[in-house]
Curated annotation (Swiss-Prot):
The heterodimer acts as both an ATP-dependent DNA helicase and an ATP-dependent, dual-direction single-stranded exonuclease. Recognizes the chi site generating a DNA molecule suitable for the initiation of homologous recombination. This subunit has 5' -> 3' nuclease activity but not helicase activity. GO terms for molecular function: 5'-3' exonuclease activity; ATP binding; double-stranded DNA binding; helicase activity; hydrolase activity, acting on acid anhydrides. Its EC number is 3.1.-.-. SUPFAM superfamilies: P-loop containing nucleoside triphosphate hydrolases, Restriction endonuclease-like. It comes from Streptococcus pyogenes serotype M28 (strain MGAS6180). Pfam families: ADDB_N, PDDEXK_1. This is ATP-dependent helicase/deoxyribonuclease subunit B. One of its GO terms (biological process) is double-strand break repair via homologous recombination. Its cofactor is Mg(2+). Belongs to the helicase family. AddB/RexB type 2 subfamily. The gene is rexB.
Amino acid sequence: MKLIYTEMSYSMTEILVNEARKAADQGYRVFYIAPNSLSFEKEREVLTLLPERGTFSIIVTRFVQMSRYFTVESSPSKQHLDDTTLAMIFYRALMQLKPEDLPSYGRLQNNSVFIEQLVELYKELKNAQLSVHDLTGLDHPQKQEDLIKIIELAETIMIQQDYNQDSPLQSFARAIKLGLLNNQLSKTVIVIDGFSRFSAEEDYLLSLLNNNCQEVIIGSYVSQKAYQKSFIKGNIYEASLHFLQDLAQKYHIKPVFATSNQVFKPAFSRLTQLFEATHDFSQVDWQLQKNDLDHFSLWQCHHQKEEIEHVAKSIRQKLYEGYRYKDILVLLGDMDAYQLQIGPIFDKFEIPYYLGKAEPMAAHPLVQFIESLERSQRYNWRREDILNMLKSGLFGCFDDSDIDRFEEYTQFADIKGFTKFSKPFTINSSRQYPLDFLNEMRQDIVLPLQELFKSQKQLGASLVDKLILFFKKIRLAENMQGLAQSQLEVEKNEEVWKRFTDILTSFHHIFGQEKLRLSDCLALIKTGMKSAQYRVVPATLDVVTIKSYDLVQPHSKPFVYAIGLTQSHFPKQIHHSGLLSDQERARINEIRNYRHFDIASAENSKKNHQTALSLFNAATKELVLSVPTVINETFDDLSPYLKELISFGLPLLDKGKNYLSYDNSDIGNYKALLSQIIAINRQDLIEMSDQDKMFWTVVLRYLRKQLRKQQLELPTSDYRLSTKPLSKEVIEVCFPKGIPLKLSATALTVFYNNQYNYFLKYVLNLNKTESIHPDSRIHGQYLHRVFERLMKDHTQEPFDNKLKQAIYHTNQESFFQQVYQDNAEAEYSLAILEDIVRSTAPILQLNQNIKVIDQEKNFHLDMGNEILVHGIIDRIDQLSDGSLGIVDYKSSANQFDIGTFYNGLSPQLVTYLAALKQIAPHDINQLFGAMYLHLQDPKLDLVTFKQIDNTLVESIYKALTYKGIFSEVEKEHLSTGAYQTKNALYSNDELETLLNYNKYLYLKAAKHIKKGHFLINPYTSDGKTVQGDQLKAITRFEADLDMAQARRLVTLPAKEKKECFLTLMRKESHL
């Protein structure tokens, strides 16, 4: 064995490549070993250093792959054992054990997290060269007994199913020990680069290779200063020193110092020396030179998005200077926090990248499909699961519009559960759903699912066969091919499909002869797919590489950007969270010398120093270290390592927000510039100098010219939210000349509430989602129908009998039977409505002097100027003197307010008065008023009553009164009835004013509607809060940002409120 160390200013790879070349020139076969995470990059680096740029004598690979070179022909043809297969084997083992067999883990038998921990423990045991019987000294002896039962049973299943229990390294080591590879290894040289520690499995293999290979060469970075130190605790080279010292002691050799021809920039060497001096308690009498600072940058940004954008701009600048994407490396402090954001931002700046991390399959449509299939079976055809399965695009041949129509109907008819899905759809509504088409679609969905879900407990092999038959019926494979929209997606889908078929194969192999329920089968496949990962190799090498910062090696790329280096992530603190604690691992390691667990937490300090050292020397030309103030929506501090750099004299640059400028980094990329122009177009203008304004004026002129060529435009508006007028063609179709504009009191209220709401409801005719379950609209219909029947009954029957008959016959109507007898909730609603009817009906019995002239009276009121107002009057009453009045039933409290009417928000009663005046063209003296009747079951607070007497009954009847507009002329006749006339009496002239102003409201609204321009203007009564319908989901209206667009209501003091509003009405309606 030969151990080599060198300073950070030299290239260890070049030194080791020279050693490899010498061995290759002598006829030896050379294996150049790199860590798993670096083998691809190391291969490119080694081949670049070779003069011939390639050779068959030097193979750059990993330990595992090297073992396959030697054992590929001699290894037994057994099944491969991966993590998913291991999880299934442990699941099968746990199925065979009873809870009482496992005192410690019996309750976790079906827990997926526990099974994952078993898989990790089993892999750890293999890497540590330990068996489950070596797990002595655990906190609870019962734990070892349970683990022995589980793992031994799992290993028995592996033997039965012919799985290879040995890892590739174990098979390689066994072949070496048996002397099967002596001839090959005698002509082999092993070169190892990039390691600072070996696992127990690698350590054992290395001892065998050292005895049988021609030579083993290992290199590591250690400074000469550190190598000569006797005390190395806390030294930045502590990990490498321990690594070399352990090897030197074990193999009785002395490490040698070597140098390379390539020497990196002195600035990085000087920074390393300062960093080393800080941690080995020595001092230096110099600081970084001014020109050294050109190679380092410390950035501070507010949050992640700004940080990534600054990096993207800097990368575009490097390209402008002539460098390539492959010259750039981006390192992430927190891979999970940055992974979702960095892709879209780099795409915006048109920067191709390769994320060096396996992607989880959990977000792929195929996994979502399998999960929905499993949940559909487990939860008995729940609607959400069936729809999610369809929306994955992998079930059958359905268009998106078909799925939307199916979803709309199933929500309306409340289709959920197998019983409802299996029966033909028969319920329809005013929208007239295409039931024939929907039933055909229902059959295409239900039949294959029903055939699969009726499977009883049977052999796993039979279940897999039925699953495959089901996949064929729904055209799963063909649909999977149709998902891809690009070559990259095709490659991703191929990898996902391969993992899917591997999981099915493993399940068939492990559970083929085991009896299982379909639910267990689907759950196992789902769990395997959700935990699986896949990796796609980039189509070109000229990409920006992105990976976690703790995987970096010295001198990786000319330009390195390390972002997210906050105190929480740099340094990283790694802790085990498996079935064994670190203390238990340590006790086991004390007993076993050469077989041991890796305890990450015990090596955090020296590993973090090693990582920081590699990071500070990762670049050969320029290193940028960046930290956000806010990461994952939480504030974080500077890393202690970055604070050290600041103490060395490196300035911390506050990058600030990404304001637009005319620097190359801002305008050098068309797509990024366009996106920023759009962003600034949507926000308030920032302050600019005259020079900036001139520049951006020219740029906008140029951009608009380019956009016109592509038929695109940048909208401009004075408000954050704006609407466009309808075109003349649309106006002619929606409001044709010669045909009156149809309005109603409700439509007018909606218009004055928010014009855009009127546009949605009455121009686009958009409706809310329907439902067969009774809502306030259907409740109102029921109450109206009961009172209509009651008031039509002129027989001599007692009033209570009439009421019972009205309720009974209404309940027997087919529509109400269908609505209110569907389930217990609907029956409960009906019971409440019946109580409301019984509570409100007495008010009709008291007013025996009233004669009901008509009910549910349709009217069409001609307002002139091609405006036709239509509606339905619930009831027309006649007093004893012949005067007429209107009653409007309400299921909620309503009261006429003259201020609300003035602002257009309560025109109903006055509109009905105008209609009654047209229907019965008599003098206004014959109208006694228009009123609301609140249909309610009055609630009284008994605490306020000292005793139960007549005052209690009076309070009930007081709540059941008519409230609205009343004629002052009819005051005497109204005083004997249940009319609330206080502050509600109007003279004939005042009633005429109300009628004329009501007409003015309709004419004003109609004029605006016919122009076809509808504003987003919900009303506000105080200028501080918005009471109108904001329609946030559609308009994105925000009260704090868009208050200027809200319509301010006219409000007046309570004193003389009525007279002041009437004066305003006369003025505005020109009376």
